[in-house]
Amino acid sequence: MLYKYKYIIYKKILSNSIMTNIENANSIIDKEIISFLNKRKNNSIELINYNEVDFTLNIDNDLIIKRIEDINTYRLILDNLIKQPLIKQRTTEWFEARKNRLTASDLYDAIKDNKISDSIAKKKAKIVKDNTNYNAIKALKWGTMFEPMATRIYSQINNNIQIYDFGLICDPNNEHFGASPDGITELGIMVEIKCPYSRKIINDYIPEKYKLQIQGQLAVCNLKECDYIECKFLIIEDENVYIEEFNN
């Protein structure tokens, strides 16, 4: 069985719900941060080849200092998160812990149209039983299968940046709210990955459901930035078809 990923999109979301410039890289050494700041572009996607970056460009030193300060702050937060006892994603314990907690992935359904969802409230309060067989949902199975591949792609494109895996993290101020981020980089940048089963990926667009999910995750982790990644994967059984698709 052969796999091909069609495209990957990187978007930056800040915790104030404003989508900023699309950014394809963060890095741990100052020169790379400088080049990253110089290469930022509004409403566009740009891959940066660090071997071709001109480090002599005139830039705002205050902006550089602020960026480095932010990264250092994020790293301190990351260090604290790593020390916390966490519940590994998709384990029996993880599913049980989510049953009576509102999680970041529930936010859109819980408050869409400015209305509180009675059905979600009843499930979380265990007034009604949630009989959903999540393993039988094709879109969830698809995303779970390809998420590790998308994570590796993201890491490789970003100079093999280390990504820490997290399970359920409970809000320190509200034990009834939690989040399970897909990962957090060594720079303290959150990563949220979607591998849609059938939904078309649209450039410069993040579904509202996922915007709210990311805001919830950032709030729980006390972080401010998230790279949102979407990967479209194709499963191709025939080698000739694979070669044809690859060449296209």
Regions found by a protein language model. Give the residues of each.
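Charged, glycine-rich intrinsically disordered N-terminal tails and low-complexity linkers that flank
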Residues: 1-145, 149, 157, 235-237, ...
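Short, well-ordered alpha-helical scaffold segments within catalytic/effector domains
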Residues: 147-151, 211-214
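Active-site region of the double-stranded beta-helix
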Residues: 154
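Nucleic-acid nuclease catalytic cores
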Residues: 157-181, 185-248
